């Protein structure tokens, strides 16, 4: 165990893999991405790249050895604090106007930038600072590779009312589960995109985010607190030269009614946004410096992060162990869809919703040595036949909120209520072994397969 003194307005940056390290605040005050640390109790961190900042100076007790650690004197925290005060000013304006006009909204902020520029960290800081002033902005995550209160391949939103759980895998906290939580559980709204990148199927991605945006603004219209507090939208990494992503970004801005764009880590992107929205008087584009602690996330680290999120979803962690239910189901009773990439989409029909073909059409696709008979192939989904269920081995399946009798268009339009893991498939007996976080039968037999795989 060692003690680390952090001077005022400095931060201690660290990287840790395994085993976990334990950090305790001994004196002073400190915060982890905006969330204030309590004096005394230990905090456990594993497989994270983090930073603890102090405004007045503090002393930490650290047990364990981070792979990288140093104290940084130059940080952008003052800029982030000023940004928070600017957003709070807009919330006060909306609050004052709300007395006479219920349509007055607080700031709807979109954070954009290239890979590993610190967008999610800034969102956590702004969310935590807002909570300290009794504001509760809706948090939105549109990055399917870095889930928020969900599993990889999903986009989600939640109306936060409590502090973030900094020890959780994603740094936000836990959604409702079968066990107790140290911090009040969050209740997210989740849509399954199912693919790694928005560019894998831009039309499906834009459809999913439009449904999520509709729900967010429905919540804001019904709650004065949410309406005045506004929303914070985190996006996936921008590929500056990808024209399709610029189209996606425009959909995000219009669907979520964004009035502030925060650009991190790219002068070129900032100039592009300023030029593109020069005539949009309702939209402000703000350039903010990335922290010097931002580190490129290697593909291996992203995969480990996703695996940790999946494991925690089913088995919990050291603070809250969970026991998932292993169930054997009749695969003939399930309706399983596979999410299509744009290059795989079937021809669009002008008379059927969302581009789906007639149910009696069939297409065959070769996947290695397995012949897949996939029914009703459409623009976004294709139904997997019982004979082809072996491809589900080790897959994470999203459980749709609609029943198996609904058509594919309704499934695409609907949110999901959870996930199951396919641990075994017996194509001879038409049986499938599923791991479920809930000790009861599946609430819906309509399941969706994306690209997410996991090895227990």
Curated annotation (Swiss-Prot):
InterPro entries: Clp1 (IPR028606), Clp1/Grc3 (IPR045116), Clp1_C (IPR010655), Clp1_C_sf (IPR038238), Clp1_N (IPR032324), Clp1_N_sf (IPR038239), CLP1_P (IPR032319), P-loop_NTPase (IPR027417). It is found in: Nucleus; Cytoplasm. The keyword GTP-binding does not apply. Coiled coil: none annotated. GO terms for biological process: co-transcriptional mRNA 3'-end processing, cleavage and polyadenylation pathway; tRNA splicing, via endonucleolytic cleavage and ligation. Belongs to the Clp1 family. Clp1 subfamily. ATP binds at residues 11, 49, 116-121. Required for endonucleolytic cleavage during polyadenylation-dependent pre-mRNA 3'-end formation. Component of a pre-mRNA cleavage factor complex. Interacts directly with PCF11. This is mRNA cleavage and polyadenylation factor clp1.
């Amino acid at each position: 165990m060692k003690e680390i003194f952090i001077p005022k307005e400095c931060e201690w940056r660290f990287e840790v893999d395994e085993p976990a390290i334990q950090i305790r605040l001994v004196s002073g005050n400190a915060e982890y991405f905006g969330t204030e640390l309590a004096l005394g109790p230990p905090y456990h961190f594993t497989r994270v790249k983090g930073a603890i900042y102090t405004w007045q100076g503090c002393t930490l007790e650290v047990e364990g050895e981070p792979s990288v650690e140093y104290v940084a004197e130059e940080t952008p925290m003052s800029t982030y604090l000023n940004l928070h005060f600017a957003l709070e000013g807009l919330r006060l304006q909306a609050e004052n106007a709300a007395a006479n006009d219920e349509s007055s909204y607080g700031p709807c902020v979109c954070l954009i930038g290239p890979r590993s520029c610190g967008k999610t960290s800034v969102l956590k800081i702004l969310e935590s600072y807002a909570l300290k002033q009794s504001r509760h902005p809706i948090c939105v995550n549109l990055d399917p590779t870095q889930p928020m209160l969900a599993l990889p391949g999903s986009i989600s939103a939640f109306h936060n009312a409590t502090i973030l759980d900094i020890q959780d895998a994603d740094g936000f906290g836990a959604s409702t589960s079968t066990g107790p939580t140290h911090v009040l559980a969050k209740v997210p709204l989740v849509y399954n995109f199912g693919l790694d990148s928005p560019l894998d199927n831009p039309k499906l991605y834009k459809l999913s985010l439009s449904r999520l945006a509709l729900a967010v603004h429905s919540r804001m219209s019904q709650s004065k607190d949410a309406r005045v507090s506004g929303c914070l939208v985190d996006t996936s990494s921008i590929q500056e030269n990808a024209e399709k992503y610029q189209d996606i970004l425009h959909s995000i801005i219009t669907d979520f009614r964004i009035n502030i764009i925060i650009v991190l880590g790219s002068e070129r992107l900032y100039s592009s946004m300023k030029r593109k929205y020069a005539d949009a008087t309702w939209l402000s584009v703000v350039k903010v410096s990335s922290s010097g602690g931002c580190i490129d996330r290697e593909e291996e680290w992203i995969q480990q992060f996703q695996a940790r999120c999946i494991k925690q979803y089913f088995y919990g962690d050291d603070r809250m162990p969970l026991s998932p239910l292993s169930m054997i189901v009749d695969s003939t009773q399930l309706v399983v869809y596979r999410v299509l990439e744009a290059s795989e989409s079937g021809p669009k029909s002008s008379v059927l919703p969302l581009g789906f073909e007639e149910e009696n059409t069939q297409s065959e696709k070769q996947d290695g040595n397995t012949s897949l008979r996939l029914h009703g192939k459409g623009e976004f989904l294709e139904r997997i036949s019982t004979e082809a269920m072996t491809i589900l081995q080790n897959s994470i399946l999203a459980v749709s909120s609609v029943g198996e009798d609904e058509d594919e268009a309704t499934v695409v339009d609907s949110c999901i209520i959870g996930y199951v893991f396919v641990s075994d498939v017996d194509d001879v007996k038409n049986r499938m072994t599923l791991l479920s976080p809930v000790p009861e039968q599946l609430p819906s037999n309509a399941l969706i397969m994306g690209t997410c795989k996991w090895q227990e």
